């Protein structure tokens, strides 16, 4: 057996059975699993895992050849009479000790609620503790914070939905609102405790370090406990191997970025040419940076990156919020003497981030204001590229760039290749982030940063900026012009380790909707700094669902039943469009369907198969305010799917909304369409796990897209009529993409939301394109699409990024071998 592939990732008891113990990990492909308690064989079952997490994929990439399994061991009730559980990977006479655990350790885990803290923040001056995480049990779980004397303290508790957690516990139904945000007040002493308690009195406890010493001890205790559990279970070699696998997997992924950098790095010749370039416009950048006891090495790196700029009309405005005894005062005074473009305001009082940034803005004289953090750096061409963009688009009010992350040594990692301005994406997560440049006139209209939003002050500021300008005046430069430092304590290092930022972000987004006059509820998703919006539906609009069908009554019945029995929205009309069915039982089913459901109606299309014409025909019988095109091989998962789609579709600026579609194995089939992939259009991030977040949260966030699939597509009736329905020259393929692009040409947004989720048993509607005739028909429509949208294809999809692959659909980096002219 290949012992190098052996690995245990996690273990736990089933919530609803104290005798069922589950172990998840990796073994060699040929291995079977055997479980023993003090040498006595235990009943167990090992199930193959086919849908892998990101970590599992990384391990497979680095070290292929194993299989991932979920082992369920049945333990005796009298566990106290035994000493040790041992689990072996077995192949013939070969045996490998895969996992072991003392029964005393097992018994400590039995029957308790599951408690996990994603992040914690300690505000010592205010005696405040902020916690974020999740807790589940077989009965409702209460949460309370206690001080070091075990006395309860006042808390504000907010629950949030964590579908990713609910999916983990498949053995029983758990509360999907198992996520939490807790703000505890007046927490004194050196430590505190978060206690999760179920209705049976069983407790799980998380220790919170308040003082710096206790925080260190608490973290050290947690890490050492995990390491010792791993050591006892797997041995020191497995502990080391697991750590190395994680590091090497990351290194391998980063290696692709290093290759991309070599192929795309700006040359010295180009930098020299930039220095010689003179723009007619008077563009002066003021880079404002709040400082607080900044590490001198990091401060030097920042200042040096500004001094190295190829565009010279800038000023660096620094505000030292360290207070009267600032440890960096002398070095800042030296910088001021070194270059008159470096300006510093020294503050006698310590300042928080917003007030500190505002102080820097107060000394800025540029007509464009740029923002940076005190431990980050700029690319050498940052200001040049910004000036070039402004010169070409002088109407621009706000410009942002791509960015990557650098570690403490300056190694470049994890590029953020962003889309062009995407307002619905921004309302889920601050994807814009850095580098941001704002025209002074927009800043004056918007106002300064607001201290009450500290932690998400930049998110609040960006949202307010969008309220005071037009979308066309927000520009994106698809170049990496900013390097975001990742180290302990930075948001780049762990964005979810600052729950106060989440609370401020939620407040900022709610305020944005209120100012815009939009009725909506905002909720944190549990995914780091990602929010979801629930719009209030206006009135009681009807949704007419159009379902083309040819035979396949079993699929159709599953689809219709799921709509009418699972949907929480009840004002529904279902129009089944019969087209060329051949089986007699199909027509018997239609009769039964109309008798069973008053909302259902069957109409007959007599012509040859033409998806566009069939839906246009069905739409004539619809009397809904919204039309929803739906394949017959779909099944509703999310009960609130229609509300979530209508919430966006009812907005004046939105024309079309698409849903997240899954294969039956709970992997992604559709999460938006990128126009240009494979030379015409394609889905992205297919095959990822249902709850994976995807590249830059693309699977977990609502976004504006160029197109969505017609397998589940909602459109305003007025927009459908203005477009005269689907274009019937696209009989089989690309009719949905063409429909979306024509809606965008009307100035309407096309929105993808993962909050509406369905299964899609793809291709059952009409079969695969697997005959020469069908392939020729599809190719003809592809050629037609390419000709119609030639200019769009050349420019590239604005909601994608030219640095990402248009050959693959997994948001891989676009390498030199991808030549656009060979594809379009």
Q: Which residues does each predicted region cover?
A:
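Short, acidic, metal-binding catalytic loop of nucleotide-sugar glycosyltransferases
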Residues: 303-313, 392, 561-571
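A short, conserved alpha-helix in the catalytic core of glycosyltransferases
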Residues: 442, 452-480, 509, 641-645, ...
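Glycine-rich, basic loop-to-helix element that forms the pyrophosphate-binding segment
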Residues: 347-364, 605-622
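A conserved acidic beta->alpha catalytic loop
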Residues: 320-330, 349, 373, 578-589, ...
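N-proximal low-complexity "stem/linker" segments adjacent to membrane-targeting elements
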Residues: 230-305, 510-565
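Basic, ligand-binding patches in group-transfer machinery
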Residues: 1-238, 278-282, 300, 529, ...
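Short aromatic/hydrophobic "clamp" motif used to bind/position activated sugar donors
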Residues: 369, 627
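Conserved donor NDP-sugar-binding/catalytic core segment of glycosyltransferases
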Residues: 381-413, 487, 634-680
């Amino acid at each position: 057996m290949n012992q190098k592939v052996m690995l245990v990732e996690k273990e736990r008891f089933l919530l609803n059975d104290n005798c069922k113990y589950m172990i998840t990990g990796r073994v060699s492909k040929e291995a079977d699993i055997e479980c023993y308690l003090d040498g006595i064989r235990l009943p167990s079952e090992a199930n193959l895992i086919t849908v892998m997490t990101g970590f599992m994929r990384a391990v497979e990439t680095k070290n292929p050849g194993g299989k991932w399994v979920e082992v369920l061991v049945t333990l005796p009730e009298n566990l106290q009479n035994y000493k040790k559980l041992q689990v072996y990977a077995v192949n013939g006479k070969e045996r490998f000790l895969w996992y072991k655990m003392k029964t005393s350790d097992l018994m400590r885990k039995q029957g308790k609620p599951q408690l996990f803290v994603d992040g914690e923040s300690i505000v010592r001056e205010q005696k405040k503790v902020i916690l974020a995480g999740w807790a589940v049990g077989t009965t409702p779980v209460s949460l309370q914070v206690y001080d070091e004397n075990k006395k309860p303290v006042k808390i504000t508790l907010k629950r949030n939905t964590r579908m990713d957690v609910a999916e983990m516990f498949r053995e029983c139904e758990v509360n999907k609102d198992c996520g939490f945000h807790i703000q505890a007040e007046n927490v004194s002493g050196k430590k505190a405790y978060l206690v999760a308690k179920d209705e049976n009195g069983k407790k799980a406890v998380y220790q919170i370090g308040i003082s710096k010493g206790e925080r260190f001890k608490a973290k050290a205790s947690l890490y050492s406990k995990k390491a010792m559990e791993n050591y006892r279970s797997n041995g020191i070699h497995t502990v080391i191997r697991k750590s190395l696998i994680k590091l090497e997997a990351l290194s391998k992924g980063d290696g692709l970025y290093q290759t991309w950098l070599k192929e795309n790095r700006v040359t010295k010749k180009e930098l020299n040419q930039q220095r010689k370039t003179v723009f007619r416009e008077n563009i002066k950048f003021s880079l404002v940076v709040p400082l607080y006891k900044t590490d001198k090495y990091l401060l030097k790196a920042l200042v040096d990156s500004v001094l190295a700029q190829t565009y010279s009309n800038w000023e660096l405005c620094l505000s030292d919020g360290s207070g009267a005894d600032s440890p960096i005062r002398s070095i800042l005074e030296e910088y001021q003497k070194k270059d008159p473009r470096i300006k510093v305001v020294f503050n006698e009082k310590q300042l928080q981030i917003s007030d500190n940034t505002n102080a820097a803005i107060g000394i800025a004289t540029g007509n464009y204001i740029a923002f940076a953090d005190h431990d980050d750096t700029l690319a050498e061409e940052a200001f040049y590229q910004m000036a070039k963009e402004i010169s070409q688009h002088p109407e621009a009010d706000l410009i942002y760039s791509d960015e990557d992350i650098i570690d403490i040594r300056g190694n470049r990692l994890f590029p953020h290749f962003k889309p062009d301005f995407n307002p619905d994406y921004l309302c889920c997560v601050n994807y814009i982030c850095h580098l941001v440049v704002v025209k002074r006139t927009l800043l004056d209209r918007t106002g300064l940063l607001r201290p009450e939003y500290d932690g998400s002050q930049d998110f609040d500021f960006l949202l307010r900026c969008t309220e005071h300008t037009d979308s066309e005046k927000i520009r994106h430069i698809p170049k990496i012009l900013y390097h975001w430092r990742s180290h302990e304590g930075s948001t780049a290092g762990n964005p979810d380790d600052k729950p106060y930022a989440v609370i401020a972000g939620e407040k900022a987004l709610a305020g944005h909707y209120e100012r815009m006059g939009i009725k909506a509820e905002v909720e944190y998703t549990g995914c780091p700094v990602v929010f979801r919006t629930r719009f209030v539906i206006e009135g009681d609009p009807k949704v007419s669902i159009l379902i083309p069908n040819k035979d396949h009554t079993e699929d159709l019945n599953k689809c219709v039943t799921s709509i009418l029995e699972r949907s929480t929205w009840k004002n529904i009309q279902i129009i089944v469009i019969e087209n060329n069915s051949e089986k007699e039982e199909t027509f018997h089913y239609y009769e039964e369907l109309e008798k069973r459901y008053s909302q259902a109606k069957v109409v007959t299309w007599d012509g040859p198969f033409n998806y566009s014409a069939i839906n246009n025909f069905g739409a004539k019988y619809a009397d809904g305010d919204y039309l929803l095109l739906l394949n017959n091989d779909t099944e509703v998962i999310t009960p609130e799917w229609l509300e979530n789609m209508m919430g966006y579709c009812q907005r004046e600026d939105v024309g079309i909304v698409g849903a997240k579609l899954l294969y039956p194995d709970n992997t992604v089939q559709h999460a938006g369409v990128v126009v240009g992939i494979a030379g015409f259009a394609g889905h992205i991030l297919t095959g990822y796990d249902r709850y994976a977040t995807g590249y830059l949260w693309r699977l977990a966030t609502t976004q504006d897209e160029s197109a969505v699939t017609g397998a589940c597509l909602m459109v305003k009736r007025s927009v459908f009529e203005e477009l005269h329905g689907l274009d019937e020259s696209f009989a089989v393929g690309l009719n949905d993409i063409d429909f979306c692009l024509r809606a965008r040409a009307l100035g309407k947004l096309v929105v993808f939301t993962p909050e509406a989720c369905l299964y899609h048993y793809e291709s059952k509607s009409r079969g695969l394109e697997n005959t020469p005739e069908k392939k020729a028909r599809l190719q003809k429509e592809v050629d037609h699409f390419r000709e119609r949208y030639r200019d769009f294809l050349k420019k590239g999809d604005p909601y994608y990024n030219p640095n990402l692959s248009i050959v693959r659909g997994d948001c891989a980096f676009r390498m030199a071998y991808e030549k656009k002219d060979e594809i379009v």
